[in-house]
Amino acid sequence: MLKTLGAQIKEFKKDSFLTPVFMILEVLMETIIPLMMASIIDNGVEAGDIHHIYVMGGCMVIVACISLFAGTMGGKYGARASAGFARNLRKAMYENIQTFSFSNIDKFSTAGLVTRLTTDVTNLQNAYQMLLRMCVRAPISLICAMIMAFFINARLASVYLIAVIVLGMILAIITVRAHHYFMEVFPKYDDLNASVQENVSAIRVVKAYVREDYEKKKFTQASKNIYNMFVKAEGVLAFNSPVMQIVVYSCIIALSWLGAKMIVAGSLTTGELMSLLTYCMNIMMSLMMLSMVFVMLAMSIASAERICEVLNEKSDITNPENPVYEVADGSVTFDHVTFRYNKTSDKPILDDVNLSIRSGETIGVIGGTGSSKSSLVNLISRLYDVSEGAVLVGGKDVRSYDLDTLRDEVSVVLQNNVLFSGTIYENLRWGDKNATDEECRHACRLACADEFIDRFPDGYNTYIEQGGTNVSGGQKQRLCIARALLKKPKILILDDSTSAVDTATDAKIRKAFAEEIPDTTKFIIAQRISSVQNADRIIVLDNGVVNGFGTHEELLASNDIYRDVYESQTSGSGDFDEKGGDQ
């Protein structure tokens, strides 16, 4: 864990080194000041030596200024180092997340990743700054104060040892108890973020089902759980202050009583007693700071472990040593492909799939929910790796390609598409950042998106709200199809992406595909047989097994599942879901 986190500090080694240096300088200056005060009282005030008071007073001001300068510089470099550390952590996590395959992403919840990128990183930032400053300042101050106290009067300094031992034991108990509660807080932050995310992203569904009160209660409960944990933790930490005060005041009373007796006896001066009392406060404050450091470190350890889970998670899909940088054509072959999401699972999602698809063919993929239609096409762009067998694109195993090269040649349009905040032009150019306005319009004509875009007052400069909330489901799907076409892919996958489009528009889109992109291999996943019956060939999937593969006419003649569903759909009484489960 330390090695993983330490890699994010390298850029700020100088700041991380200078911070404790200035902290040590500040502590040394603060340690000298009580001695100078004692000298002013004993050799200046009581002796009536004004010159000595002026000289020592001037020196004390200089030392205080040096201490102030050192503290300021320590704070500056500490803030720079901790903020830079946090920045690098966020960047490293975000960049690593971008490399994740779908199977890596499945290990984390979205809310959990957000919490790690925000709350957990902030905890580590605060802990690192505290580590550079307080973790240096507190023990050095404690040691210096103890040394000076024994130097002044070893007998009175023994009072410190008793106080330090008592306070140290109590603070250790408090720290351990608080750490237990803080360890339970962070998973509850995930629950809170998940509640917010689900509610905001599905606000229309919430309102449609009048579930606002339920969502409020769910959020309130998640927030209350965090509150309860923090109350317990802070309740334990609240003992810090009263315990500190009791020990400090007891120590001061003991020092004052013993010191007064020693002053009367002539074995201690007034200035020395004042110095001892000042060092007493320094020692107790150092212990207090150390206790807070331990609590913060206890919190940050939990955060550090969660962050390292993300940083140490390596994508199980990587480029080969000598990748292929060119896809010859859009041909696709499934060679005895078996696939499992969980490698330890006994039952495969896809079982011994054998298919050979020529470049430029239009392939329909039909099956009920749970028949693994999406899983099949996800293997083409290597979003997952096969468990057994091989998937070939352009005659080569997809595992031999450079990932960017392969995925640049495969465009996928999902049923639940995502549009980003920005103009229509900006969204379209996700497919090709260098696309001209005319190329964008041409892609929209193929996707039949120009029909509604031209009706917008701002046309292609119309601003799309976050998530595409100001366009309908069908409009969103057509914009996403246009975006995919701008990639000019060798393989186009439409994963039930015309489900929100009317039948007439669906037919227009299919006709445009046949005429305008005949060399592109097209996979059309659909529930409606009418959407794929004109395809060159159709794959019938049933529970992860290829039940049939052929033309519409061939399947009607030879495949019972296809024929039954076709007849039920043409009579308006059924679909593939009668044959399957979840996709």
Predicted regions, residues:
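Transmembrane helices of ABC transporter permease
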Residues: 11, 15-28, 60-63, 69, ...
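Short intracellular "coupling" helices and adjacent cytoplasmic loop segments at the cytosolic face
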Residues: 47, 83, 91-115, 119-121, ...
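ABC-type nucleotide-binding domain
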Residues: 325-583
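Helix-loop-helix
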Residues: 49-53, 144, 148-162, 232-305, ...
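Hydrophobic alpha-helical transmembrane bundles that constitute the permease/transmembrane domains
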Residues: 20, 24-32, 65-72, 124-127, ...
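Hydrophobic/aromatic residues in alpha-helical transmembrane segments
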Residues: 33, 37, 74, 78, ...
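An intracellular "coupling" helix at the cytosolic face of ABC transporter transmembrane type-1 domains
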Residues: 10-13, 99-103, 119-132, 136, ...
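Membrane-integrated ABC transporters
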Residues: 1-30, 37, 45-59, 66, ...
